């Protein structure tokens, strides 16, 4: 008979932190004392799993990065049409934010305002990777389909990332009322008409 698997305390801590970021507490600085109370452990117990609060945030950032880029790779493997790839990548990013409001606070930098600069730098690197991915998809169009975009691919990629970041910021600013994927089909029709 298999014994029930004991929940991983490290994952519990990260889950609790993400939930706190999603709640009204996420609008303020989250202390380790509040987090320990939420998890139901002492602060010392938190530090047995993570040497610092920054490491807890790093754990969530690693989850964000792994979740997004593993799916990006799947999109690139499964889909070859440039515009479809862009559409799916945009939808992926917006849906990820919608499903993970607490993590979206991290991605906008809102939750990292009073934290270590290194954390904000990690988020910046994620967005730079996303922009690079858009740029690569756009540049490959010339090779795959034999036609270029009327505007430089770097400018288009920056515009696409700006749209995503704007949607994330609006979502956080509205206390998660304005869903990033709301009206996506109309949003995509407008955007795709501009970049063709």
From Swiss-Prot:
Main location: cytoplasm
Domain HTH tetR-type: 7-68
Lipid metabolism listed as a keyword: no
GO biological-process terms attached to the record: cell division; negative regulation of division septum assembly
InterPro entries xref list: Homeodomain-like_sf, HTH-type_TetR-like_transc_reg, HTH_TetR, NO_SlmA, SlmA-like_C, Tet_transcr_reg_TetR-rel_C_sf
Subcellular location, record wording: Cytoplasm, Nucleoid
Source taxonomy: Bacteria, Pseudomonadati, Pseudomonadota, Gammaproteobacteria, Vibrionales
Complexes and interactors: Homodimer. Interacts with FtsZ.
MF-aspect GO terms: DNA-binding transcription factor activity; transcription cis-regulatory region binding
DNA-binding region, residue intervals: 31-50
Family under the similarity heading: Belongs to the nucleoid occlusion factor SlmA family.
PROSITE patterns recorded: HTH_TETR_2 (PS50977)
Keywords for the protein's UniProt record, in alphabetical order: Cell cycle, Cell division, Coiled coil, Cytoplasm, DNA-binding
Disulfide bond entries: none
Name listed for the protein in its UniProt record: Nucleoid occlusion factor SlmA
Coiled-coil blocks: 71-93
GO cellular component, one term: bacterial nucleoid
Purpose: Required for nucleoid occlusion (NO) phenomenon, which prevents Z-ring formation and cell division over the nucleoid. Acts as a DNA-associated cell division inhibitor that binds simultaneously chromosomal DNA and FtsZ, and disrupts the assembly of FtsZ polymers. SlmA-DNA-binding sequences (SBS) are dispersed on non-Ter regions of the chromosome, preventing FtsZ polymerization at these regions.
One Pfam family in the UniProt entry: SlmA-like_C
């Amino acid at each position: 008979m298999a014994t029930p698997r004991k929940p991983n305390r490290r994952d519990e801590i990260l889950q609790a932190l993400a939930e706190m970021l999603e709640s009204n507490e996420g609008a303020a600085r989250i202390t380790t004392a509040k987090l320990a109370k939420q998890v139901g452990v002492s602060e010392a117990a938190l530090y047995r799993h993570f040497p610092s609060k920054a490491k807890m945030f790093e754990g969530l950032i690693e989850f964000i990065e792994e979740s997004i880029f593993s799916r990006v790779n799947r999109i690139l493997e499964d889909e070859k049409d440039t515009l479809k790839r862009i559409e799916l990548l945009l939808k992926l990013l917006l849906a990820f934010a919608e499903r993970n409001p607490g993590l979206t606070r991290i991605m906008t930098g809102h939750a990292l305002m009073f934290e270590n600069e290194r954390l904000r730098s990690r988020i910046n690197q994620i967005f730079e990777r996303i922009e690079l991915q858009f740029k690569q998809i756009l540049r490959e169009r010339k090779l795959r389909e034999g036609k270029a975009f009327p505007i430089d691919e770097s400018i288009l990629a920056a515009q696409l990332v700006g749209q995503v970041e704007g949607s994330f910021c609006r979502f956080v600013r509205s206390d998660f009322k304005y869903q990033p994927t709301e009206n996506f089909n109309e949003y995509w029709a407008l955007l795709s008409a501009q970049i063709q």
